[in-house]
UniProtKB/Swiss-Prot annotation:
One of its GO terms (cellular component) is centrosome. The gene is PAFAH1B1. GO terms for molecular function: dynactin binding; dynein complex binding; heparin binding; microtubule binding; phospholipase binding; protein heterodimerization activity. Originally the subunits of the type I platelet-activating factor (PAF) acetylhydrolase was named alpha (PAFAH1B1), beta (PAFAH1B2) and gamma (PAFAH1B3). Now these subunits have been renamed beta (PAFAH1B1), alpha2 (PAFAH1B2) and alpha1 (PAFAH1B3) respectively. Residues 1-38 are annotated as: Required for self-association and interaction with PAFAH1B2 and PAFAH1B3. This is Platelet-activating factor acetylhydrolase IB subunit beta. Keywords: Acetylation, Cell cycle, Cell division, Coiled coil, Cytoplasm, Cytoskeleton, Developmental protein, Differentiation, Lipid degradation, Lipid metabolism, Membrane, Microtubule, Mitosis, Neurogenesis, Nucleus, Phosphoprotein, Repeat, Transport, WD repeat. Residues 83-410 are annotated as: Interaction with dynein and dynactin. It comes from the Eukaryota. WD repeats lie at residues 106-147, 148-187, 190-229, 232-271, 274-333, 336-377, 378-410. SMART domains: LisH, WD40. Regulatory subunit (beta subunit) of the cytosolic type I platelet-activating factor (PAF) acetylhydrolase (PAF-AH (I)), an enzyme that catalyzes the hydrolyze of the acetyl group at the sn-2 position of PAF and its analogs and participates in the PAF inactivation. Regulates the PAF-AH (I) activity in a catalytic dimer composition-dependent manner. Positively regulates the activity of the minus-end directed microtubule motor protein dynein. May enhance dynein-mediated microtubule sliding by targeting dynein to the microtubule plus end. Residues 1-66 are annotated as: Interaction with NDE1. Pfam families: LisH_PAC1, WD40.
Amino acid sequence: MVLSQRQRDELNRAIADYLRSNGYEAAYSVFKKEAELDMNEELDKKYAGLLEKKWTSVIRLQKKVMELESKLNEAKEEFTSGGPLGQKRDPKEWIPRPPEKYALSGHRSPVTRVIFHPVFSVMVSASEDATIKVWDYETGDFERTLKGHTDSVEDISFDHSGKLLASCSADMTIKLWDFQGFECIRTMHGHDHNVSSVAIMPNGDHIVSASRDKTIKMWEVQTGYCVKTFTGHREWVRMVRPNQDGTLIASCSNDQTVRVWVVATKECKAELREHEHVVECISWAPESSYSSISEATGSETKKSGKPGPFLLSGSRDKTIKMWDVSTGMCLMTLVGHDNWVRGVLFHSGGKFILSCADDKTLRVWDYKNKRCMKTLNAHEHFVTSLDFHKTAPYVVTGSVDQTVKVWECR
């Protein structure tokens, strides 16, 4: 590449400035003479630090070029392997594709949870910055911030209509928000430590919460009263999730177990113990996936003629396990993540499992063949949460890198 006379002169002056400002006096004198430079104060100011600036911007551009090349290679690979352009897929087989549709910034601390609204085209994110943010996932627009908690917001949950949002926090409270007026309508106190998980029960009448105080509590939406406490875990309860009809709740804990409770009696129906580290996350299988799970695992159909219920768990032991709750059996273990598994759920088509982890990836698993079929390098830091839209082709992820990303499925 040939430089013009002006470019050559600028480069020489920048080199001369670098040599002089870094104390290479002898080299500076020789170079100045050889390059026939006439240095003066006005010009000196213009070229001060220019060489370093050019150098760092070249490195930045190189990094950007490498990122774009890798995205291009992923797109080529997808095209040749019969991806979205190569063939028409059944929507039940749509999976998230790189690159992300939107990377949304606004939180000032790690994102702890992301969820889709059940009705409108919005999603909600919670963060360690003590706020909850609302975004439009179709346009990528930021809508509003909900403030009220005084410490990290750990989990959020909508009721089935999307009119109510529950949140819980390290400030030891649970808050209920009117999602139409965006106001906090109730604050519930009762846990003695960080409240790490919250879920509105399917009937919409009760909220269930889990805490570092080792308990699970059930609250009445109408009054905010605590009506039940489930005890049994020996350490911090990380997550709690009700099944589809609200008769059972599942919980997971630092005590390395997953427990399933009968809501009506508070009885622990099953204690699932095969993980070798803290269990971070759980997710119930939708009934639409029961037949394909039974087929894939050869699990017995009970006397009632109905398989299931089935449950997924993700752990710091880097594995994902699938359980048959009725027998307490571990049906399979999926191995592939290189760090703590932080989020796991079933694809709405019922054939796949999606997971995210501290290895910065979002993964899609074909559980019938027990293999990871797609790995997306989703974030710059740990991926803390994911959600899959029930009807629209979108996945959302949140990360310690403070961003929320929207992924299109096709």
